[in-house]
Amino acid sequence: MAERFKILVLNGPNLNLLGQREPELYGKQSLDDIADSLGAIAKQHATALDFRQSNAEHQLIDWIQQAAKDSVDYIVINPAAYAHTSVALRDALLAVKIPFIEVHLSNIYRRESFRHHSYLADVADGVICGLGARGYEYALQAALTTLNNTDN
């Protein structure tokens, strides 16, 4: 079956430590577990899924810029701490004009006050936080619903 859509899932700093780092906040699933789960959902929907992680802001920006060249249809991004600091990430997402959903494993509004502001939230299609790894699945389902509705 031909793939109907391309979705890029980006993960920011320290998410490579999922399952080890503060499991009471971020859960016990590893990033590989999340990638496998999303890959299975994408396959059911004939969707190409590219799942990546970097601790480097410039790498995330390079991938976002490349996404436009690769005709990516949608981005799901967990910017991690870059949500609260990176105007450059915001600018890259605005520049490519690819719709995106912001995801956070923990509820950023139950945490330190500096985490309450996201530079991406007001330009995202939506924000999902505090639902753990399921938040990624909800974001992917929302992206697929949006793409299917615009594909008609």
Swiss-Prot record:
Keyword set includes Methyltransferase: no
The keyword Amino-acid biosynthesis is assigned to this record: yes
Binding site for substrate: N78, H84, D91, L105, S106, R115
Highest taxon in the source lineage: Bacteria
Keywords: Amino-acid biosynthesis, Aromatic amino acid biosynthesis, Lyase
Quaternary structure and partners: Homododecamer.
Chain ranges passing through the membrane: none
Recorded coiled-coil stretches: none
One Pfam match: DHquinase_II
Reaction(s) catalysed (UniProt annotation): 3-dehydroquinate = 3-dehydroshikimate + H2O
Catalytic activity, EC: 4.2.1.10
Protein name: 3-dehydroquinate dehydratase
GO biological process, one term: chorismate biosynthetic process
Function: Catalyzes a trans-dehydration via an enolate intermediate.
PROSITE patterns reported in the protein's UniProt record: DEHYDROQUINASE_II
Gene Ontology molecular function: 3-dehydroquinate dehydratase activity
Residues the record marks as site: Transition state stabilizer: R21
Broad class of enzyme this protein falls into: lyase
Active-site residues (renumbered): Y26 (proton acceptor), H104 (proton donor)
Annotated metabolic or biological route of this protein: Metabolic intermediate biosynthesis; chorismate biosynthesis; chorismate from D-erythrose 4-phosphate and phosphoenolpyruvate: step 3/7
Family membership noted in the UniProt record: Belongs to the type-II 3-dehydroquinase family.
Biological classification of the source: Bacteria, Pseudomonadati, Pseudomonadota, Gammaproteobacteria, Alteromonadales
